[in-house]
């Protein structure tokens, strides 16, 4: 137990420590210049939230707003899954997502709801409006999706095109795909 990280927990062999660097060309996203913020509204799974923190850190999301009953990094399960990413992502808990979104719209943010829906436009067909560089992405509950009032208030309802049999993604997977796409559009 005291040697965890030095020896393999399965076989007991000594581990080799190697330097790990990633230079894949995507490191161009500069957190200081990112105008991408995200709302998680009533996401129930602590593990999904932790995974979302990792993706938010990886793709330089400027801020996460954890709304309603969405778990925060104060919970051990969120911290366990985020693997420390919560220390590098600005976040706050906001009890009312609709009020927050209304404020962001007044501040000039384009409000984009991400949800698997028959009425949603494909994410790949979306383009940023000229002069608009601030985007707020909305992600909803794993079972019930985005609150209808929030959906109605959004500037766009987008979905990730899926070609396989299962027509929906886990919210953490959808978050990762969406923030990668929007980060590349906004950079």
Per-region residue spans from a language model:
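Cysteine-centered metal-binding/redox modules
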Residues: 21
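RNA substrate-binding interface of SAM-dependent RNA methyltransferases
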Residues: 25-117, 183
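Structured adenosyl-cofactor binding patch, chiefly the S-adenosyl-L-methionine
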Residues: 148-187
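Short cysteine-rich clusters marking metal-coordination/redox-active sites
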Residues: 8-11
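Residues immediately within or flanking Cys/His clusters that coordinate Zn2+
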Residues: 5
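Active-site/ligand-binding-proximal alpha/beta "capping" segment
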Residues: 116-163
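Short amphipathic alpha-helical segments
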Residues: 51-52, 77-79, 124-126, 149-152, ...
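Short functional micro-motifs and their immediate structural scaffolds
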Residues: 2, 16-17
């Amino acid at each position: 137990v005291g040697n965890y990280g030095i020896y393999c927990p399965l076989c007991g062999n000594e581990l080799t420590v190697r330097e790990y660097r990633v230079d894949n060309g995507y490191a161009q996203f500069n957190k200081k210049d990112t105008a991408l913020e995200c709302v998680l509204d009533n996401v129930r799974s602590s593990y999904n939230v932790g995974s979302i923190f990792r993706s938010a850190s990886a793709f330089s999301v400027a801020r996460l707003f954890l709304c309603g009953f969405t778990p925060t990094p104060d919970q051990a399960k969120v911290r366990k899954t985020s693997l420390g990413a919560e220390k590098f992502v600005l976040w706050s808990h906001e009890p009312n997502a609709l009020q927050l979104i209304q404020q962001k719209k007044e501040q000039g943010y384009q409000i984009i709801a991400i949800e698997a829906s028959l009425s949603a436009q494909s994410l790949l067909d979306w383009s940023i409006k000229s002069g608009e560089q601030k985007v707020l992405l909305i992600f909803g509950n794993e079972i019930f999706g985005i609150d209808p009032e929030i959906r109605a208030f959004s500037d766009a309802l987008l979905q990730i095109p899926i070609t396989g049999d299962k027509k929906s993604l886990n919210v953490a997977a959808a978050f990762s795909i969406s923030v990668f796409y929007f980060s590349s559009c906004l950079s």
